[in-house]
Amino acid sequence: MIERGKFRSLTLINWNGFFARTFDLDELVTTLSGGNGAGKSTTMAAFVTALIPDLTLLHFRNTTEAGATSGSRDKGLHGKLKAGVCYSMLDTINSRHQRVVVGVRLQQVAGRDRKVDIKPFAIQGLPMSVQPTQLVTETLNERQARVLPLNELKDKLEAMEGVQFKQFNSITDYHSLMFDLGIIARRLRSASDRSKFYRLIEASLYGGISSAITRSLRDYLLPENSGVRKAFQDMEAALRENRMTLEAIRVTQSDRDLFKHLISEATNYVAADYMRHANERRVHLDKALEFRRELHTSRQQLAAEQYKHVDMARELAEHNGAEGDLEADYQAASDHLNLVQTALRQQEKIERYEADLDELQIRLEEQNEVVAEAIERQEENEARAEAAELEVDELKSQLADYQQALDVQQTRAIQYNQAIAALNRAKELCHLPDLTADSAAEWLETFQAKELEATEKMLSLEQKMSMAQTAHSQFEQAYQLVVAINGPLARNEAWDVARELLREGVDQRHLAEQVQPLRMRLSELEQRLREQQEAERLLADFCKRQGKNFDIDELEALHQELEARIASLSDSVSNAREERMALRQEQEQLQSRIQSLMQRAPVWLAAQNSLNQLSEQCGEEFSSSQDVTEYLQQLLEREREAIVERDEVGARKNAVDEEIERLSQPGGSEDQRLNALAERFGGVLLSEIYDDVSLEDAPYFSALYGPSRHAIVVPDLSQVTEHLEGLTDCPEDLYLIEGDPQSFDDSVFSVDELEKAVVVKIADRQWRYSRFPEVPLFGRAARESRIESLHAEREVLSERFATLSFDVQKTQRLHQAFSRFIGSHLAVAFESDPEAEIRQLNSRRVELERALSNHENDNQQQRIQFEQAKEGVTALNRILPRLNLLADDSLADRVDEIRERLDEAQEAARFVQQFGNQLAKLEPIVSVLQSDPEQFEQLKEDYAYSQQMQRDARQQAFALTEVVQRRAHFSYSDSAEMLSGNSDLNEKLRERLEQAEAERTRAREALRGHAVQLNQYNQVLASLKSSYDTKKELLNDLQRELQDIGVRADSGAEERARIRRDELHAQLSNNRSRRNQLEKALTFCEAEMDNLTRKLRKLERDYFEMREQVVTAKAGWCAVMRMVKDNGVERRLHRRELAYLSADDLRSMSDKALGALRLAVADNEHLRDVLRMSEDPKRPERKIQFFVAVYQHLRERIRQDIIRTDDPVEAIEQMEIELSRLTEELTSREQKLAISSRSVANIIRKTIQREQNRIRMLNQGLQNVSFGQVNSVRLNVNVRETHAMLLDVLSEQHEQHQDLFNSNRLTFSEALAKLYQRLNPQIDMGQRTPQTIGEELLDYRNYLEMEVEVNRGSDGWLRAESGALSTGEAIGTGMSILVMVVQSWEDESRRLRGKDISPCRLLFLDEAARLDARSIATLFELCERLQMQLIIAAPENISPEKGTTYKLVRKVFQNTEHVHVVGLRGFAPQLPETLPGSDEAPSQAS
């Protein structure tokens, strides 16, 4: 027997009050005992959290005992955790004796919403010796331990051999593993399944009858029969598809003749017009080529006559172009002269402003020094006046208030101390430890002399600094000039670079003076170069016309040769009349042969089209008529073989269909009569009892029962006897077995199991030996497996049958096509190709035409050579006078050399213009660059040191001065003497006040006078700065304007510009004079050419009209060809046999087809409109659009699920083959797919009966359950009256409602819904569709009503409701219901799980004190009988003698809260035993 899985322990890590606690769980009942707040609910919450880690469901309410003095510390999940990492782990062992630890890592998330982060995990392969607390904690010392985070736990487990650690990202994966390993009873695939499981656990935890469960008992107890629903849905989908296909076939059959007629007439209509246009295009193209040849010849003649005119026009154009260039050059020279004059004026202004700026710069520097000195003196006067003002104010305030004077006298005692401090400071600064107030005056003179000496030294260095600074400024000025000219450079290179720049400046000035002579020389050479280039152009033009290059020395000889050639050509005469006549005679013979071949070509093309179609259909190539006849014999043999194979496959397919239908019967009955007999006898088919047997056990039970596997199990055989009399409608052998269908087992036989066989001892003298069948059919799983394999085989057979049927009909049609070909085209199909011979003859005709054309061209070429020779002589007459210029090869080099020298001179002039002023300034001061005053820095350091020494001496003198000034303060040693001399004090204050006021007056006068002087200095400085800035800005504007002008303003620029302007004016006058002469000559030449032009104008007009016509036709034909190729209809329209018909015949053919098409498309608005538009003869592409529209229309009408091709012509050919076969096959398939209403009712009834039997089996387990006055609990299952009526009508009266089930417009679900509405018109269906209602009616659970009933005291059986029961009774009843649900889940999930696993069973019960001792004992008995574990909680020990009891006490020690746990196992059968580890106190992590 398979052992049931158990929960071994629960481990809490870092929970509120539990740092590291493991609760060993009893195999039956584990009791948590303790007062309010002890941690019972926290422990159960940890268990539930590890079981269902879904934050959307978890909600732990306060369920502690009412009236307790201490309130509950539970605040949901967040309040039950402590800060840091927390764990809740369940240690389990399943039926395979595998240890599995599942749990969750919890951690509080910071924030006001009090969230908790949960990570589920599982550990497999853990040794039994390892405790859960050892895994997740690390001992630091004897009193401290640390909780490991999840990543460290993972690393720790991975280091252990054979241990597997899995972390889950989804709760579904976590529960899937728990289900597969037998930890939970049901596979939780969705959030809805998890919600049901949590509601069950929650109902168990809080006790009582859960309304959430009792209201939806059907969802909890009755499994969903999804297989039946899916079978109905697949059946309806298949029927719908089948009917749609049949309808498409019927539509296609009705349209088949229309398709043929439409395609045939549309092809004749469009192809005739297409080929007519193709023929006309070829004729027009030939005419256009002939016109082009004639026009080309005429243009050549006209070109020869116009040569003179072109030559003169070219020369005139050259002079016109030269005149424009000369005018532009002349205008540019005038503008340049104006710019040079403007630039010279600007340069004079710039020089004046630069001189003014230099003078202002010197004055500005001097004024800055004056202002700085005046500011220093002003600051000293302000300080002296402020000190005098403060002293006067102080003395006046002392005299105004006598009491204040007394305070001052008291203050002088403080001044005495300050005098002593001043004396000490003077000793320190002056390094005089023996200094006294009396000797301070002597030392003061000494240090004042030292200060004077330091001041004189500083002034001397300051004077040296000024001198050095002057030299430094000159060096900087020269250095900056060098940088401005040369660019950035090192200071030590300034002297060498400056000398180089001065030497370069001299050279540049020398070069700048050569600009004008070089420019005049360049102008002269350029004029000669232009004449030379003109002569070279004439020579190049002559060589180009002659097609050969000539040297200068050869020109005179060539002139004589051309004159001799002209004489010879004028005397030669060509006579080729006889040759021309022979060529024309041969051309006429070829034309006659071509005409005869064109008459034979259409017949041959028709035969070839038929032959090509046969080759494409059969995939063979035929080279003779004998090949055709031999292949026809092979075709007949192949047809016979395909028919035989098709019949064999069809027979096997029918056999498979019959077997599938037989195995698909509900209840496993292969004979429908057995179902009726079972209902009649009040029994159950043996196959239904064993319907749930697994696929592995099916061979055994099939062999065990042998022929009696289709027996009927009846409660009493004696009651069946009377039914057997006269029984005829039954199988040949009917087996009856007596037994209880609800508790039937296989103990009716004595069986010995052998290897793949059994021996059944039916009686003492009768044994039966049965081997295990290779293909078992006993049980639903075995039948479904066999049906699945049969379906796969049927699909293969159906596909093979369809292929063979298509091949047979295709072969038959191919045979007919061969027969037609032999009768019509075999005589001419294998003759030679007439079109190939026509092409050869056309090639010869073209050669003859070319020969005639060459004969004419030879004569024409001789005339052209004569004209060319005359033109050559004329050109040489113009070239020979300029031979001397052509021989001068160095002229261009000399021009380039002079131009380069001129560029250098102009660049030098630009350098002088740009840097001349800087070089002039640099030349007088360049000597200062020889030595860089580097000692200027050392001088600055010495000056700074002397300033520091002077400041030190001044401080020492000031310190001694302060001592000397405070000598009077040394006499204030006695305060009483100071107070007694009040009158003397008053007099002294007045004297001092007069002195202070006099000093203040002097300071004010000095300050006022110096302020006026400083203001004058600042005004002068501001005036200088303003003048300097204004002139600087004007100078910059002038320089920018000069740069914008872009002209060098040197001394000779104006003269050069004026000379250049006069030269260009003279050249322009000469060119205008020559142009006038050429215009007069050209006018005379054009008058002579007009006569020749009129002769050719008519020919040109005719040619262009024909060319325009050809181009227009070509554009339209290109659009037609593009449309034909894009739509793939060229093969249909380009019918080569039509090319040999005349235009009238083709037009007549197209008109006849048009009349037929008008009748054919009269009912189709779209095609009618397109046909009407295609009748326009000027728009041939519209006929193609009509043909494409016809093809598109036919493609849309042909269903791709019937005919898989895009070509309507091919589709029509395949259609005739497929339609009859598909119609027959689909009709039979619809009959097989349809299911009768009686079968539906039987399926639903059998399912309801099976589930009622299962509920009765569950009720048997609760018969002896009693809680208080409740003596028993049961589930009552009834069929709803309205649904029972529906089942009766479906099985008995379905003939009356065949209008619903035989309708093609309604699916079976919709027909079932309509029937339900017809039977129950009083029920409001709301907004639900008939399809939705029908699908609900196919679910057997909607036919049942379930409720929980209890047998309570004298009331008998009544509905279980919380209001009618006491608290303890409600808890016990609810627990019974939950046990029933868990057991039902296990039965439902048995197929999905391994057969060797029995899942864990565990429920909760909080606050179990509400149950009495008898109810507690009942719970214990129920747990023992059902092998179920139970965790209960109560304030006191309920039954310590049974199960395992934990006593929980919450304590506070040193501000640390923990729960003290003591565990006891049941002591009824043995002495009490303290559980291991119950005394250890929890440690807190430091």
Curated annotation (Swiss-Prot):
GO terms for biological process: cell division; chromosome condensation; chromosome segregation; DNA replication. It comes from Escherichia coli O81 (strain ED1a). Pfam families: MukB, MukB_hinge, SbcC_Walker_B. This is Chromosome partition protein MukB. Its main location: cytoplasm. NCBIfam families: PRK04863.1 (NF003422). The hinge domain, which separates the large intramolecular coiled coil regions, allows the homodimerization, forming a V-shaped homodimer. Homodimerization via its hinge domain. Binds to DNA via its C-terminal region. Interacts, and probably forms a ternary complex, with MukE and MukF via its C-terminal region. The complex formation is stimulated by calcium or magnesium. Interacts with tubulin-related protein FtsZ. GO terms for cellular component: cytoplasm; nucleoid. Gene3D superfamilies: 1.20.58.850, 3.40.1140.10, Immunoglobulin FC, subunit C, MukB, hinge domain. GO terms for molecular function: ATP binding; DNA binding.
